[in-house]
Amino acid sequence: MPLGTVRKVEALRHDFRSAAQLADMLGVSRSQVTRWLRGAGIDPLNAEKVDLLELVWSNLLRVYEREVALSWLFGINPHLGDRRPIDLVRGGRTEELMRAIRAERSDSFT
């Protein structure tokens, strides 16, 4: 069963250890994350960013430990044309991100 967006925000806040870090990753204000956690509605664009970050993060944790996964999110990635994955999360670039993760997974098993 899919998790609701608020539950994803709660889980991501826990994983990233603060609402401030989660807000930075999503490109929103910390107060916006706090409002979502208090039950304020989330607009479709930001809900998609939350969904994408949760998808990317859960896939990365299947391959890497937490700190390496964070480095992957914020590092320059050759599979993404030397762009940072977190910037593609903010831009909603699902296909490119999942392709890069698949490439990472295949590299890690060879």
Regions found by a protein language model. Give the residues of each.
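Non-transmembrane "mature" sequence context
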Residues: 1-110
